[in-house]
């Protein structure tokens, strides 16, 4: 009898812990709001190489953008530039954009290989881009917070291990992307630690 009660308590404890963990994950995932392509009036993409993302790679866009600036206009400009005759890309180069104010925007389809403008092959990479030049300005708190949640969201949603997290410069010798101020958070392990906390 005591044995039966003991094991019943163990089962109840496990269920409680699982529900608690699930509730925690659902709570922060509700904070991840992705603005769709339709809201920044994206042009239709050109059919391109397909892939399955198996790692997460972070970039910065590399030109000045303040919290008060128009992120939608910037993203639309990136698409026009990338799909122009000089590059002939299929779409914007990244799968997601994060503005300085923390808003997250949908980029190209995650099933489509991204672009990097450098020598590394982005096949298999899910690309998240922080708008702005993070070699020149500190990462805004809202942008950093959204980046951490977005990495965790992508890890959980697309079943990509967070341990694969890296940056553009980790794959290319031709760039300082994602900028020294953002890269500091990767070097000291802060971003990966915070992502891990969300996923636990």
Where are each of the predicted segments found?
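Bacterial N-terminal signal peptides that target proteins for export
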Residues: 1-8
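Short coil/turn segments at secondary-structure boundaries
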Residues: 3, 66-69, 138
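Bacterial N-terminal signal peptides
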Residues: 8-16
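Basic/polar, cationic surfaces and motifs that engage anionic cell-wall
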Residues: 19-61, 100-116, 121-200
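Secreted/periplasmic proteins that engage bacterial cell-wall peptidoglycan
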Residues: 49-110
């Amino acid at each position: 009898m005591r044995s039966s009660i003991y094991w019943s308590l163990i089962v109840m404890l496990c269920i409680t812990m699982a529900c608690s963990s699930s509730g925690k994950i659902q709570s922060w995932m509700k904070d991840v709001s992705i603005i769709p392509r339709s809201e920044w009036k994206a042009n239709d993409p050109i059919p391109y190489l397909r892939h399955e993302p198996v790692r997460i790679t972070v970039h910065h866009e590399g030109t000045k953008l303040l919290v008060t600036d128009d992120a939608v206009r910037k993203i639309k400009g990136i698409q026009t530039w990338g799909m122009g005759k000089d590059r002939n890309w299929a779409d914007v180069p990244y799968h997601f954009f994060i503005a300085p104010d923390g808003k997250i925007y949908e980029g190209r389809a995650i099933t489509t290989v991204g672009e990097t403008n450098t020598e590394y092959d982005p096949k298999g990479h899910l690309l998240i881009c922080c708008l702005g030049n993070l070699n020149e300005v500190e990462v805004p708190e809202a942008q950093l917070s959204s980046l951490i949640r977005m990495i965790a969201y992508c890890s959980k949603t697309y079943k990509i291990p967070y341990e694969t997290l890296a940056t553009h410069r980790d794959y290319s010798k031709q760039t300082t992307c994602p900028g020294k101020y953002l890269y500091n958070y990767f070097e000291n392990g802060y971003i990966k630690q915070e992502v891990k906390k969300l996923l636990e």
